[in-house]
Amino acid sequence: NVTVDWIIPGETHTADNFAPGIEAAVAQGYDAIATIAGDAGVAPFIDAAVEAGIPVATFNSETDAPNMRLLFVGADLYLQGQTAARAMADAVGGEGQVAVITGFFAVEAHELRRTGFTDTIAAEFPNIEIVGEVENTDQGDIAFTQAQDFMAAYPDLKGIYVTAGGPFGAAAAVADAGKAGEVQVVSFDFVDETMQYVQDGVIYATIGQNPYAQGHDPAIRLFNYLVAGEVPPCARLVTEAAVVTADNISEYWTPAQ
């Protein structure tokens, strides 16, 4: 018999929230732990759990700080940022002003997506100017206001890149301003609000990361490790990063009935 408990330690992917959650799971005697590892501060708590005999898998976000986790399941986040940069370049015709809205500057996963984007723009698309970078704490309403502010400050703005949560807020601002197709949005994830804006032509592209696998694989592989000593075939299981646009959205999403 197996029981999987879903614990939400806080609203941000930082050690301030996740470290106490890992400590609590250790204290409560869980046999294994799967956790987001959003910043380096989580690493010593992962190590403490492993040293207490509790295997740990990380998913979605992984710190670069060395730690004793068994495996990571998630996207190559820097590569996702590079993919987003090329999608944006396609959307804006390789030139113009682009703004960046990230979730948290302190979350390593968001930084990888941000720097993958900005590095690629600088290296491959010299005619694209990044006019500003702000954080929205993964909130759609904040992204809405920030997108409005960018469009007001830069009347010739051609694109908005959202690295993490709340891209539908930026898309709503673009739609409300009557600038769908004029200000292009590139984002991540296949949540319904985002996919509707893709279908409507407001979001040019959104990039997936297979969240089902990120939930499924850590649980199954930790179970197999516990009961059979089966070690995962590799320490990093990288999920697919499909790029969805209005042209192929029917392959990935159907509107809710």
PLM regions: where:
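Exported/periplasmic ABC-transporter solute-binding proteins
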Residues: 158-159, 172-212, 220, 227-231, ...
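Hinge/cleft segment of the Venus flytrap/periplasmic-binding protein
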Residues: 105, 109, 120-122, 210-257
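Flexible loop/hinge segments that line or gate small-molecule binding clefts
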Residues: 40-79, 97, 191-199, 203-204, ...
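Hydrophobic alpha-helical
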Residues: 19-22, 32-51, 117, 132-195
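Short beta-strand elements in bilobed, periplasmic/extracellular small-molecule ligand-binding domains
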Residues: 1-14, 18, 97-100, 121-140
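Short, solvent-exposed amphipathic alpha-helices that sit
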Residues: 1, 17, 80-84, 108-128, ...
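Short beta-strand elements at the ligand-binding edges of bilobed clamshell
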Residues: 10, 17, 63-87, 100-104, ...
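Hydrophobic alpha-helical segments within soluble ligand-binding/sensing domains
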Residues: 72-98, 112, 143-144, 190-194, ...
